[in-house]
């Protein structure tokens, strides 16, 4: 049968207990979103990540430590009359958590798993004319973030991408890993991998995950250092960030890959215990 896009399925089912309309979720799709979040939480905990809930607003100093602020002016929302911005990703909030601190070398790597809403204008080059919930102004994302010793950061990035790949393998979503060229990477990253999911309704691979090693770019701007021994010279940590799962985009991938010819969506096996059913 001809597979539909997630948007087409949502429009067709408007008014039922399951629909996608702009950024509204109803019924079983809300449960599906919660199921993905619950599965991701347990998955990262088993991998040794500490769960963290970051602030959803940061000041300009924190933002400028994590990114080149001018590049994000058309992407993130500023709170009028306040020195505060809504986070475009929890990476920015977590990166600034240890600003002006010296960490103990024996504590590294520190691995954090964060679930948070993210807010983006999706304007200019960052936004495309996408319908439905693939590209929206507000979305939920589970993030991996690591503070690492410099000599270990390449290895940690490999582990992060392996972790994300395993996650999508367990969900049963067809995907591929892409190493980005320097022209396609963000300016703060030294090396970036994307995971792209196959979307049969769109007949295309679409990005659902990105894993970057920022080396000491953020650490130098935020003054985050470490030392292995007392009185030893300090070094800058390396920071790494990666989407484990963008909830709405992963829902689109599930809807397009698990749809049936009778109009149902099979629930990935690892999520069934959270929904209490095998199809929606």
Task: Show the residue positions of the predicted features.
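Single conserved hydrophobic/aromatic residue that forms the stacking wall/gate
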Residues: 1-15, 20
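TRNA-recognition modules of translation machinery and tRNA-sensing kinases, especially anticodon-binding
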Residues: 16-17, 21-280
């Amino acid at each position: 049968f001809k597979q539909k896009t997630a948007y087409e399925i949502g429009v067709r089912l408007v008014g039922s207990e399951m629909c996608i309309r702009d950024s509204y979720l109803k019924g079983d799709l809300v449960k599906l979103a919660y199921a993905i979040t619950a599965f991701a939480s347990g998955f990262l905990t088993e991998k040794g990540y500490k769960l963290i809930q970051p602030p959803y607003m940061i000041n300009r100093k924190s933002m400028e430590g994590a990114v080149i602020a001018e590049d994000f002016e058309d992407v993130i929302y500023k709170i009028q009359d306040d020195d505060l911005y809504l986070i475009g990703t929890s990476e920015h909030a977590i990166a600034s958590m240890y600003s002006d601190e010296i960490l103990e070398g024996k504590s590294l790597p520190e691995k954090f798993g964060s679930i948070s809403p993210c807010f983006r204008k999706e304007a200019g080059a960052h936004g495309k004319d996408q319908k439905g919930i693939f590209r929206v102004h507000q979305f939920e994302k589970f993030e991996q973030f690591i503070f690492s010793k410099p000599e270990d950061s390449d290895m940690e990035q490999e582990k992060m991408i392996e972790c994300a790949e395993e996650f999508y393998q367990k969900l049963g979503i067809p995907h591929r890993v892409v190493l980005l060229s320097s022209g396609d990477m963000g300016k703060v990253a030294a090396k970036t991998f994307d995971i792209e999911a196959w979307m049969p309704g769109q007949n295309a691979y679409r990005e659902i995950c990105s894993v970057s090693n920022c080396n000491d770019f953020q650490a130098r701007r935020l003054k985050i250092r470490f030392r292995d021994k007392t009185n030893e010279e300090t070094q800058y940590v390396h920071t790494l960030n990666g989407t484990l799962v963008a909830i709405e985009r992963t829902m689109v991938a599930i809807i397009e890959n698990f749809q049936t010819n009778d109009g149902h969506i099979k629930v990935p096996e690892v999520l069934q215990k959270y929904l209490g059913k095998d199809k929606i």
